[in-house]
Amino acid sequence: MSTSVFNRRWAALLLEALTRHGVRHICIAPGSRSTPLTLAAAANPSLVCHTHFDERGLGHLALGLAKASTEPVAVIVTSGTAVANLYPALIEAGLTGERLILLTADRPPELIDCGANQAIRQQGLFASHPTLSVNLPRPTPDISARWLVSTLDSAMAQLQHGALHINCPFAEPLYGGDEQQYADWSASLGDWWQDCHPWLRQTCYPPSLYQPLAQQADWFFWRQKRGVVIAGRMGAEEGRQLTAWAAMLGWPLIGDVLSQTGQPLPCADLWLAHPRAQETLAQAQIVLQFGSSLTSKRLLQWQTACQPQEYWLVDSAPGRLDPANHRGRRIICPVGEWLSRHPAQRRTPWATELAVYSESAQAQVIETLSGQFSEAAVAHQLAELLPDNGQLFVGNSLIVRLIDALGQLPAGYPVYSNRGASGIDGLLSTAAGVQRATAKPTLAIVGDLSALYDLNALALLRQSSAPMVLLVINNNGGQIFSLLPTPEAERQRFYCMPQDVNFEHAAVMFSLGYARPNSWPQLREHVHQCWLRGGTTLIEVQVPPSQGAETLQQLVQQVTLIPQVAP
């Protein structure tokens, strides 16, 4: 009997079981040992197959697909270092909650630790970073199909957050054989093959669904107090809902760039440096934080130093999310669900002077950046470039801080990022996944080092199903380090690492459109034309290296000098 045929039957059952748990997208890298999985994915009509030659980028492509679709996404790679390349995306998913299923083909046990080619110790390779790990045995008809499908159903039922690593050893041969062999093994599942449900319907009830643990019995008391709302990373609808909720309570809402709240008090990273604003916020009796991954340095400093009577943090993600370790309440619950259970009561705003400081800071930004074509000016005016019914992907490092500090995005406009571990690896690949999941017009904005780090992901952007603009802010290096007290003599060589490149040839190599505007009107016109003509265009904005960091520091100093407002 043929080992290759049974490998494929085993893999076909594995992939079909995953589709019963909502897996629609699967990302595949080339490899021989993964042949059973690849052929099974290609033959399954329920799966949309995405391919990429770089496993690190492939993992981030899956991450982006999972972010935007909110569905579990599977990945297939061959054995060896291909598996290790999935580590960065797996780590990010563990911190931000996207569900990834990593199917890593492996050599059979007898080929491990004996000098066999492309054979490494893959079991436990990812340490504690996966939420769950399953080490499957080598496929054999001695193991029932019921065992395999039940094992997968149980693991998928438990996967509420993060990654599932399924290690899949396959023995050779991997090709050929009589496809009719071992039909009885598959047929033992009966009409399950014609069904659409899991074999084992294991239900894991989140606590918030079967008992009112998320309900705060004293909410009706605290909603009458002076409160402050901090909005971190959350979904678009949650952001809209939170904005209306805080406004009804009369509580100031300090929104992160990823909060999708519309940042009703914009330029918070600036006005939070004002002493009087800090004095006002110190009067808060309760602080409610929704979502995590705060970007603003000044907001993080205030969040760390604040001492309200109560500090509540609401997020659907498990675990500790407060680096300041406040005494208070950690409520694991979706933001929208929590808001529905804790209705607001219309009250008079208690901290109206904060709006004055915010307006003054925004006016200072407009005055300072007037007539400039700079990194800071692009961040400030970014909302003007957004496509209708589209989405935004923001990179890490300096650009996301400038957008957070100087810009104001529309309430409820979808914004995506990799702000869990906040690495610059895989940003273009993640943006490609976000675009593919939604088929919406997409603006992605990253720095030059981020673009270089994931340059071969431009191959993924050739296949955009809707207009896409990759906006590369080329400040010649990692200029985030110009914001930090790095030693000046070593800053350029060891921190910023300028590369003195432009991206025109990269765009040509991958058959992408390209433009390099020299003014804001040119940039705006190029972007708007991209939304009309479709495809992917790389637009490069070349700016003076340290100007963005210097402008932010200058504005922070200027805003601290704004005259105090009488309470």
From Swiss-Prot:
Its EC number is 2.2.1.9. One of its GO terms (molecular function) is manganese ion binding. It is an enzyme of class 2 (transferase). InterPro entries: MenaQ_synth_MenD (IPR004433), MenD_middle (IPR032264), THDP-binding (IPR029061), Thiamin_PyroP_enz_TPP-bd_dom (IPR012001), TPP_enzyme_TPP-bd (IPR011766). GO terms for biological process: menaquinone biosynthetic process. Transmembrane segments: none annotated. Disulfide bonds: none annotated. It catalyses: isochorismate + 2-oxoglutarate + H(+) = 5-enolpyruvoyl-6-hydroxy-2-succinyl-cyclohex-3-ene-1-carboxylate + CO2. Its cofactor is Mg(2+); Mn(2+); thiamine diphosphate. Gene3D superfamilies: 3.40.50.970, TPP-binding domain (3.40.50.1220). Pathway: Quinol/quinone metabolism; 1,4-dihydroxy-2-naphthoate biosynthesis; 1,4-dihydroxy-2-naphthoate from chorismate: step 2/7; Quinol/quinone metabolism; menaquinone biosynthesis. Binds 1 thiamine pyrophosphate per subunit. The keyword Nucleotide-binding does not apply. Keywords: Magnesium, Manganese, Menaquinone biosynthesis, Metal-binding, Thiamine pyrophosphate, Transferase. Pfam families: TPP_enzyme_C, TPP_enzyme_M_2, TPP_enzyme_N. Belongs to the TPP enzyme family. MenD subfamily. Catalyzes the thiamine diphosphate-dependent decarboxylation of 2-oxoglutarate and the subsequent addition of the resulting succinic semialdehyde-thiamine pyrophosphate anion to isochorismate to yield 2-succinyl-5-enolpyruvyl-6-hydroxy-3-cyclohexene-1-carboxylate (SEPHCHC). Homodimer. This is 2-succinyl-5-enolpyruvyl-6-hydroxy-3-cyclohexene-1-carboxylate synthase.
